Amino acid sequence: MTRTLPAGLTVTARVPASSANLGPGFDSLGMALGIYDEIEVRTTDSGLTIRVEGEGADDVPWGPSHLVVRAIERGLEHAGVWADGLDVVCRNVIPHSRGLGSSASAVVGGLAAGCALAAKLDESLATAADELVQLASEFEGHPDNAAASVLGGIVVSWTETSAEAQAEVPDHGRVYRAVRLDPHPTLRPVVLIPEVRSSTAHTRGLLPESVPHGDAAFNVSRAALAVVALTTRPDLLMPATADRLHQAQRAPALPLTTRWIDRLRAAGIPATVSGAGPTVLALGTGEFPAELRALAAEEGLRVVEPGLAEGVLVD
């Protein structure tokens, strides 16, 4: 039986951005970044009100189709509760359509807020992190960004479609899993964010249906090396961020991104496409060179040093 939440319950979720792939770890490796959206939710007697501030305020729907609202309602449904009304405020800082996991952050924040409201009614309804990863990944279709925003740090994620997995989540048929890795303490991510946007669906459409065995073997070795480089051996980040499966294939759609990745790597700075782009992710341990920062600004890229982040927090 579905239980109804009383009016007046309030929660606030603070959810980080994320960068996926990290070079060779296509749809598997992810990293939480210290750029945050905030979602405030209050239960009311009836209806839905939503206000969006900041990034994307003029582009997203202010109604029940808003991704955050859908995620809140899914979180409530998962916990077996309902609210007669909701007042939702989204304060957005994460750039949209830039390869920084803004949709995953919206989903994770909404789910976490919905589940936290249920836990205020009954602590036994609290949702575990692995459940949040599953629920958020069902929205996204893959777990790399979602898992990073849930767990924080660096994540390795994967999808199971076995008969056992299908029995575990019969309504979805896929089990999404992730483990968190603690990044090396000297790791300093830098993101170079262009003004232009990129469509994940479009850039995914540029990928071939199959790849040569040699390229697959190359990426397996580099993805394994990336786990080592990101956690214990940052001196190996240059070879560990090399890729043959997706970046070159997407290059025609991301000329500015590709030029900057080549420029940074030529300067000895490990760099990759952040997610589907167009943001560039640089992974180093020292100061980002001032001359490159100035050149990036001249070419319309915003340079941000966000730091690594912990996962979603709810008050």
Curated annotation (Swiss-Prot):
* Catalytic activities: L-homoserine + ATP = O-phospho-L-homoserine + ADP + H(+)
The record's Gene Ontology biological-process terms are: threonine biosynthetic process
Biological or metabolic pathway of the protein: Amino-acid biosynthesis; L-threonine biosynthesis; L-threonine from L-aspartate: step 4/5
Binding annotation for ATP: 95-105
If you read the UniProt record, what top EC class would you report for this enzyme, in one word?
Answer: transferase
Q: Which Pfam families match?
A: GHMP_kinases_C, GHMP_kinases_N
Which compartment or compartments is the protein found in? Cytoplasm
Q: Which InterPro entries match?
A: GHMP_kinase_C_dom (IPR013750), GHMP_kinase_C_sf (IPR036554), GHMP_kinase_N_dom (IPR006204), GHMP_knse_ATP-bd_CS (IPR006203), Homoserine_kinase (IPR000870), Ribosomal_Su5_D2-typ_SF (IPR020568), Ribsml_uS5_D2-typ_fold_subgr (IPR014721)
Q: Which UniProt keywords apply?
A: Amino-acid biosynthesis, ATP-binding, Cytoplasm, Kinase, Nucleotide-binding, Threonine biosynthesis, Transferase
Q: Per UniProt, what is one GO molecular function of this protein?
A: homoserine kinase activity
Question: Might you give the EC number(s) for this enzyme?
Answer: 2.7.1.39
Q: GO CC annotation: what is one?
A: cytoplasm
Q: Which family does it belong to?
A: Belongs to the GHMP kinase family. Homoserine kinase subfamily.
Q: What does this protein do?
A: Catalyzes the ATP-dependent phosphorylation of L-homoserine to L-homoserine phosphate.
This chain's protein is named Homoserine kinase
**Species whose genome carries this gene:** Nocardia farcinica (strain IFM 10152)
